[in-house]
């Protein structure tokens, strides 16, 4: 029996930017894609739809931003709302995945590789964070 290739797309949702990454479940490979602007937590749905149609993922993962103690915060509710909107728009399974420490890890990874080019406003931290979320999800769901 031939397994269907599972393409998974992950989002690091923010009120100003949304990082996107793509991955493949069988090989476990991941790749950060791009960062889309978000105005007051409202995503650019046309761009998300375009990326969705290009990659045709089988599943979506949205980072779940919890406080360090595991409690929810305002951005947690906005991320959950974003996940529900993705489900309704694309008629696809969306899972939430704990994203604590991903931004810190993304900054560390970026700085290690590109320390001479590090500029806080121009770094792809959000898409790297989305890739970390996806890698974590793949590791827990292999």
Curated annotation (Swiss-Prot):
What biological function has been recorded for the protein in this entry?
Could be a nuclease involved in processing of the 5'-end of pre-16S rRNA.
Its keywords, alphabetically, are: Cytoplasm, Hydrolase, Nuclease, Ribosome biogenesis
Q: State where it is primarily located.
A: cytoplasm
Keyword Hydrolase among UniProt keywords: yes
The entry's family comment says: Belongs to the YqgF nuclease family.
User: Which NCBIfam families does the record match to this protein?
Assistant: RNAse_H_YqgF (TIGR00250)
GO BP annotations listed:
rRNA 5'-end processing
Organism this protein belongs to? Blochmanniella floridana
Q: What is its EC number?
A: 3.1.-.-
Q: Where in the cell is it found?
A: Cytoplasm
Question: What is the top EC class of this enzyme, as a single word?
Answer: hydrolase
Provide a GO CC annotation, any one: cytosol
What CDD domains does this protein map onto? Answer: YqgF
- GO MF, one annotated term: nuclease activity
- InterPro entries reported in the protein's UniProt record: RNaseH-like_sf, YqgF, YqgF/RNaseH-like_dom, YqgF/RNaseH-like_dom_sf
The record, for PANTHER family, names: POLYNUCLEOTIDYL TRANSFERASE, RIBONUCLEASE H-LIKE SUPERFAMILY PROTEIN (PTHR33317:SF4)
Q: Which gene encodes it?
A: yqgF
Tell me which HAMAP family the record gives.
Answer: Nuclease_YqgF (MF_00651)
Q: What is the organism lineage in this UniProt record?
A: Bacteria, Pseudomonadati, Pseudomonadota, Gammaproteobacteria, Enterobacterales
Supply the name of the protein: Putative pre-16S rRNA nuclease
